[in-house]
Amino acid sequence: MTVLDSILDGVRADVAAREAVLDFAAVKAAAAAAPPALDAAAALLEPGIGVIAEVKRASPSKGALADIADPAELAAAYQAGGARVISVLTEERRFQGSLADLDAVRRAVSIPILRKDFIVGPYQIHEARAHGADMVLLIVAALEQDALASLIDRTESLGMTALVEVHTEEEANRAIEAGAKVIGVNARNLKTLEVDKNTFGEIAPGLPTEIIKIAESGVRGTADLLAYAGAGADAVLVGEGLVTSGDPRKAVADLVNAGAHPSCPKPSR
């Protein structure tokens, strides 16, 4: 069993437990009653290389990363630093996240929020909207093709943006076929947890021009952002490098300023 398989087994059990408390009809009603979603795709297309800043306590590869007692305070610092989108991990077992974190961040910031989790079915899509998410992560490696296409449609039907994550050219082709408009190329292989920063540069140039391209994993500083920008990234998603920085607001601002500098490569579209 791969690391991804193990995570997905836990997620399915946790979703079933939540659905036993709040059924699908109730979570759909809560999603319908939520304020309209913000346009995350438009935020990512603003001038310069955008930064998606992540609230991340732990990971399967590194274990505990940061003791984030107040995710709202961290998210507010990210927004003050110029982040375009706040990513909030809600997977509990390996990443120590929660839907309560999502709620807290939604109350604290006015920019779009990404629910970062391992989505396995429609319940979680409506759950994300009910808790204030504007964007949802869909991992190609975790989903069959029909489910992927269906979940992209459902995400968009609720006014949210789907960030479709890939790690190989085959997965990128599947994402395009399923109708993805925003594709994240993860340098980390979720089956082995190994990181190869060259992955983005190998996959992104083959994506259609109109696709919004996000580089995920491996950003430790401005040099990494500039390298990803040179390979065609519209934005970078950064978690560990921010929560371990000691000054998250400044760390975000440094990346944002590098992405806005005239010397920074600009995506062609």
UniProtKB/Swiss-Prot annotation:
Transmembrane segments: none annotated. Its EC number is 4.1.1.48. It catalyses: 1-(2-carboxyphenylamino)-1-deoxy-D-ribulose 5-phosphate + H(+) = (1S,2R)-1-C-(indol-3-yl)glycerol 3-phosphate + CO2 + H2O. Pathway: Amino-acid biosynthesis; L-tryptophan biosynthesis; L-tryptophan from chorismate: step 4/5. One of its GO terms (biological process) is L-tryptophan biosynthetic process. PANTHER family: INDOLE-3-GLYCEROL-PHOSPHATE SYNTHASE, TRYPTOPHAN BIOSYNTHESIS PROTEIN. This is Indole-3-glycerol phosphate synthase.
